[in-house]
Amino acid sequence: LKILVTGGNGEFCKHLVELGKEHSFLTPIKQPMYPGLDVRDYWNIDWYFKQKQYEFDYVIHAGAITRPMVIHEDNPTLSIKTNIVGTANVVMACEKYNKKIIYISTDYVYEGIDGDYKETDAMKPFTKYGWSKLGGECAVQMFDNHLILRMAMNRKPFPHPKALKDMRKSIMYIEDAAKVTLKLLNEKGIINVGGKSQSVYDFVKEENPDIQPIYLKDISDVNMATDCSMNTTKMKKVIDDTVI
């Protein structure tokens, strides 16, 4: 397959390219003589799609502002321009040039209380980051040829000395999330992508026995949730256990 990936500087994109040797990737990044692909600028995107339209058929839209989470609270305008308007710009270009969009979303679009969320469950983000990604999902769903992957992924090794003991998620490492994405490219609709439900602390402790616990009450700069775990039955029907 011929695939354009936004967010080319990110670890997720790098794993996609490394793991997807059988595919052809375009990863436009900023260079001295090239400004890169700015999703906030529709005409920049349109120009790139027009120049490269015969070099790709799929767009994995992973370009977004994610961390630190507090940036979405402190600067919602930047979050809107990048994660909502930027996604809408990519969608419009995909519609114009007849490309399939695979949108990398998040488990933070769910309410984060009851856990085991299915793709059909109601969405009620508990952070402005979650709202920004849900806004992107709305734009993506306006275009029929789409796939939305709601993910819970983290770097390996875990980049912090402490991990939440009282927050459950369905986390997987970024490399594993990239493996799953490559197996799902021809699917459509919405699919939850993640590992088993467990606390962030327990997930990290499997690789780092020295990790220290931290609790939700210790975090004050951004809203957090107790249980963002997802039901991944739909994902498991498509991939086999050897993928992750």
Segments predicted by a language model, with ranges:
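NAD(P)-cofactor binding segment of oxidoreductase domains
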Residues: 73-102
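Active-site Tyr-X1-5-Lys
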Residues: 124-152
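Active-site "gating" loop of Rossmann-like NAD(P)-dependent oxidoreductase/epimerase domains
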Residues: 65-77, 106-126
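Substrate-positioning beta->alpha
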Residues: 151, 156-186
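N-terminal Rossmann NAD(P)H-binding glycine-rich loop of SDR-like oxidoreductase domains
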Residues: 1-22
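Mid/C-terminal beta-alpha module of Rossmann-like enzyme folds, strongest
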Residues: 180, 184-227
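NAD(P)H-binding glycine-rich loop region in Rossmannoid oxidoreductase-like domains
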Residues: 42-82
